[in-house]
């Protein structure tokens, strides 16, 4: 039986990894072993940061809502509690958008929350 040489398969495998590593800095897009390590790390970072992004945006929204709430004489937690008591269901993304782009609407929501809190 003839000996099977894996040249074609190996070259295809290496080319696939090096293609994925295109644009990486230094030897990481040239040398197969370092490119392979970097591609594996890149997949790990992408997986991790897709989840981290959700947390980061929520933090950003809360920060923006808190800043706008304090301009209206409430803390973030007081505003959220007041909105819940007033049975106003607005998610944090929409509240943050209102805080940045439509201050009058946000003030109206803050006033409704204040009324329910008795302030």
From Swiss-Prot:
Pfam families cross-referenced by the UniProt entry: Ribosomal_L20
Keywords, in A-Z order: Ribonucleoprotein, Ribosomal protein, RNA-binding, rRNA-binding
Molecular function as annotated in GO: rRNA binding; structural constituent of ribosome
GO BP, sorted A to Z: ribosomal large subunit assembly; translation
Any Gene Ontology CC annotation: ribosome
Family, as annotated: Belongs to the bacterial ribosomal protein bL20 family.
Function according to Swiss-Prot or TrEMBL: Binds directly to 23S ribosomal RNA and is necessary for the in vitro assembly process of the 50S ribosomal subunit. It is not involved in the protein synthesizing functions of that subunit.
Listed name of the protein: Large ribosomal subunit protein bL20
Organism: Streptococcus sanguinis (strain SK36)
